[in-house]
Every structure is written in C-alpha cells, then in structure tokens.
From Swiss-Prot:
Its main location: cytoplasm. Zn(2+) 1 binds at residues 152, 155, 209, 212. It is found in: Cytoplasm. The keyword Lipoprotein does not apply. This is Chaperone protein DnaJ. CDD domains: DnaJ, DnaJ_C, DnaJ_zf. Gene3D superfamilies: DnaJ domain (1.10.287.110), Heat shock protein DnaJ, cysteine-rich domain (2.10.230.10), Urease metallochaperone UreE, N-terminal domain (2.60.260.20). GO terms for biological process: chaperone cofactor-dependent protein refolding; DNA replication; protein refolding; response to heat. It comes from the Bacteria. SUPFAM superfamilies: Chaperone J-domain, DnaJ/Hsp40 cysteine-rich domain, HSP40/DnaJ peptide-binding domain. A zinc finger (CR-type) spans 139-221. The J domain is necessary and sufficient to stimulate DnaK ATPase activity. Zinc center 1 plays an important role in the autonomous, DnaK-independent chaperone activity of DnaJ. Zinc center 2 is essential for interaction with DnaK and for DnaJ activity. Residues 5-69 form the J domain.
Amino acid sequence: MKKKDYYEVLGVSKTASEQEIRQAYRKLAKQYHPDLNKSPDAHDKMVEINEAADVLLDKDKRKQYDQFGHRAFDNSSGFSSNFTDFEDLFSNMGSSGFSSFTNIFSDFFGSNKSDYQRSTKGQSVSIDIYLTFKELLFGVDKIIELDLLTNCSACFGSGAESNSDINICNNCHGTGEVLVQKNMGFFQFQQSAKCNVCNGAGKIIKNKCKNCKGKGKYLERKKIEVNIPKGIRPNQQIKLSQKGHASTNNGVNGDLIIDIYLKESKVFEIINNNDILMTYNISYLDSILGNEIIIKTLDGDIKYKLPKSINSNEAIIINNKGLYKSINKDKRGDLIIKVNIVVPKNLTKKEKELIEQIYEQTSFNPENNINQ
C-alpha cells in the first residue's frame, strides 16, 4: 500500500516551520489518540501521524525525506545473501526485532515481561497559553483546566472488579506474547508477536470494573496551577513533569507541555530581545515647553522631564525597565518610548487667540527642501 505524503498526513505545507508542524501534530494527536478516539481506524491513523511527525520534526530526517521521499527510510528492499556468518544475517534483520545473533535467545526467552506488559510513560499533553505584556514581564500564576486520563480510583487501573477477577491468559501463559513462524527465502525463524487473545496484557478480566467499565482509566477534569516565571519569552515552553495522562502498567504519568505565546498589543512591542518599545502620546504644549510629564508604564507611573521642543518619533530611553534578560533574574533591558506629539483638533476661542498672537510674533519657519 502506497504511503501518504508526510506533509499531507499532518496537513501542512512543505515550507511549514517547525512550530507549525508541532501545532498540527498536537491537534491531530488530540483528535485521533486511541485513548480519546474509539473509532476502529484511530490506532492506524495515530501510527501514521506519529511516523510523519517523527520525520518532519527531525531536521536531518526531513532533509532526507524532502530529497528522496519515502525511499530515504525504506527498509523493505530485502536482505542480501552475502552474509559472512549467522551473526551478520540476524544483525541485518532490523525488522525482526533482533539486534544480533548473540541475543536471539534473550529476545525469545530472556525477559519475564513482554514489550506489551512493560510500564510505559503516559501520553504527554500540550497546551497553549497566551500572556499579556504585563504577565510576560513580571510572570504570573495561571490555573488551567483540562481533561486528563486518570487511573480509576476503584480498581487502581487494573480494569477488574476485584483481584480475583484477573486470570492469567491461557494462550500466552501470562507473557503477553506468542511465537509465530516466519519464512524468508530459504530461512525460517520464529518471532514474538502480541497475543491476540489478551491483546498483550497477559491477563483476562472476568468481571470488569463498573466504575471505568474495564478500561482502567477515565477522563477527569483537572485544575492545574502553572507558575510562569518572569523572564520567559514568547515561543518558549514550560514542562510540568508527570502532569499529563496516566501511564500503562504502573508507569509514570506523561508530562504537561505549555507553549507560551504573547497576545497582540497595540502599545507594546519587543525589540532587541530584551527591550520594550512603546508609543506614547504627548501634548504639543508639553513638547514645546519641555514640561515634566507622567508616563504610564507596565512598572507604574514614571515622572520624566522632557527636553524642550522634542519632536514626534524621537525616542525617550528609560534604562532597566524592559524585559528581564533571563528567568528569575533581576537584570533588565530598556524601555524605549517613541514620542507622538498630539495637536488638539478643537480649540477654545481663547486658545486660538493666544496661538494667533504667538504666530504673529514668531520667526520660526520649518525648512522644506524639495531638491534634496
């Protein structure tokens, strides 16, 4: 069966950034994860999504894929017959699960637990948090709510009504695996496969837990407090270990990955990594007279003595009032204020008379040279 294009699988363009690919993967993973999606094709779809993300989120693999397509990772072209010994033969059978001839027996018989029974880490969860400029600057504590797979409190994740309802699978004798015979050319060998009776669990549940209907887990709405420290930047991540979905076979929970984004602002902008640029309106009279004004900033009100005759688009620099240069440290960038001189559209009769008197007495004339 012909494989789908990895970019099509994730629904992104071939020029998509790593962030766009990561966001597309998270969206699809939430939609098709078998623990959340019970449709019969969810498992195969999730395998396809994981395979595509594994390649496209790895710079080297993506480069190979863009150049050669699926052929770059095609291991199905057969096996060479020019082996020097049996160890060479089995070391090349990457698809059989054996790393070399010397550990065939340990793969068959040396483990008390199959891959299907081993504890596995729970699925990690990714969420996006959008911060205001003030929250980004000073840090903030957020309470987030999300649905997480949690081990059943009644059966503690076993899925059984009681311990006596858990029986060893007679087909695989509790290993979760059975041996199947494979033919490859002139060679015949055995390979372990997941037991189709117990689905790799190694056990059969007689009476299922009524609380979780035998699943061992259920979705539970949880509130989680997230501390976002000062000094964090947009597009950075915070990882809360073991705050994700519950694990399988008593493994550790997955992680909660928080992607930080900045809400759009009409006032503030980040420049030079650590500086904050803001536009501030100033009265035309304050600019002419060089008055002391109150500038409202994210740090609060700041008194500032204007230089006389400051013009629009000139910058006022207030040191150490920008972003924190690193997480939970006190060194900061600068606040750069771009001045915008505001002239009133409506004047009182008295104001207009006074300005006309000044106009009649002034010799000021701004230069305009159209030949420059």
